[in-house]
């Protein structure tokens, strides 16, 4: 166990390890407003949840770092934690790690190995709130009024819909980020259109996670070289509306109504 894992007493770490971090993660998500996520062993990414094997529950942010009772981990480090757990529980199942995000209500209904309990969640909350050194690891959410599981939904795939709804409700342009080069870690990502944002006059960009330096959003996707285009956003938006009108309209209405309610 390395030094960054000693934010909490060992008996607590051992208990949270045995229950896959579920109570700790829910407690941390309640405190911070960040994203509840479960890592599963899955034969394929969209495998039914009843066929996947749960591994660990953690909290994510708008970046790629992961937080659980052991502290802050990058993706590569966290995978080294998950792989031995997957090997132990596989029972002959072949596959890889599938990371899925959930609301708290959804998480309570999942077929997890260990079910969360309110008493242990409250105990974890009390412990976390006493650990300033741990809480300092975690960034503050810019716009906690948007539930994290919804923000995650509008981060990938539906980012265009969010940007369009934000544009329609204001005066700023929706702009596509077109990628010509990724970092090595993201080198398998598709070149071309990647994400849509609202560009502000001060040069900052806004997506579902809030207004922030564009560089922060680029880092999330591992973008090195890129260009910006309002025309490309319009093209992608129209393509989505044309190809999947029911899905598009449902997604648009959902976020548009939420934005109106919090404006």
Which residues does each predicted region cover?
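A structural boundary/capping signal
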Residues: 1-263
């Amino acid at each position: 166990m390395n030094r960054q894992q000693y934010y909490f007493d060992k008996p607590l770490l051992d208990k949270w390890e045995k229950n896959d971090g579920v109570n700790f993660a829910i407690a941390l998500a309640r405190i911070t407003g960040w994203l509840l996520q479960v890592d599963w062993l899955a034969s394929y990414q969209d495998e039914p949840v009843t066929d996947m094997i749960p591994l660990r529950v953690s909290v994510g942010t708008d970046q790629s770092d992961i937080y659980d009772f052991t502290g802050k981990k990058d993706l590569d480090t966290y995978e080294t934690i998950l792989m031995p757990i997957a090997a132990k529980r596989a029972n002959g199942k072949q596959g890889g790690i599938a990371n899925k995000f959930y609301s708290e209500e959804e998480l309570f209904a999942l077929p997890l190995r260990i079910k969360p309990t309110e008493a242990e969640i409250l105990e974890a909350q009390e412990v976390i709130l006493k650990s300033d050194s741990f809480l300092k690891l975690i960034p503050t959410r810019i716009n906690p009024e948007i539930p994290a599981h919804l923000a995650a939904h509008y981060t990938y795939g539906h980012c265009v819909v969010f940007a369009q709804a934000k544009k329609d409700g204001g005066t700023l342009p929706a702009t596509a980020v077109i990628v010509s080069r990724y970092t090595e870690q993201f080198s398998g990502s598709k070149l071309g259109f990647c994400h849509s944002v609202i560009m502000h006059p001060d040069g900052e960009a806004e997506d579902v996670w809030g207004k922030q330096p564009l560089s922060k959003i680029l880092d999330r996707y591992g973008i090195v070289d890129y260009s910006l285009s309002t025309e490309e956003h319009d093209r992608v938006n129209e393509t989505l509306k044309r190809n999947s009108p029911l899905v598009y309209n449902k997604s648009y209405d959902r976020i548009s109504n939420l934005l109106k309610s919090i404006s």
